[in-house]
Amino acid sequence: HHTGDDFNGIGGMNTDLGDPVFAITNSLVVYRGEPSPGWGNTLILAHRSAKGTIHQYMYSHLHESFADPGELISRGEKIGTVGTANLNYPAHLHLELKDSTGVWIGRGYVSKAAEHLNPNLDERIFPEHSPDSLYPAPLLVTKNIRLKKAREEIMMNNNFQ
């Protein structure tokens, strides 16, 4: 199983090198870096669905990335440009969707789909494929993280009293 979808320009090969990459949802940047030469520049954005599930969108093989961890990104905002993952591949965008709250890069091919999602088949991500489902505020992701930490602190304090 390929863990994502690869998007190429109309002309193929490197015709899309440097083309803009836009965020597909309102999101929070949770990772920016180069996990390995094969991935190249990578961004991971977290988004809370209308049903409350956190999904991650991984944009890889970028030539440039313009978003920093902790930054709030709006749908349609330019976050990078299409690249070649350090000349390892012809230029293209590798886009992965994950049903996960932890930042894990992993491999580009796996034996089971696991937490990787197919947006065309998974209505949990885009109910009825409505564009409105892409708009919940990314701040809800950080709010959930803060609430979880607060609950953990309360539990720790209650267990030691």
Model-inferred region functions:
Residues 1-5, 37:
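Serine endopeptidase catalytic core focused on the charge-relay Asp
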Residues 65-77, 96-161:
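Acidic, glycine-rich catalytic/binding loops that coordinate metals and/or anionic ligands
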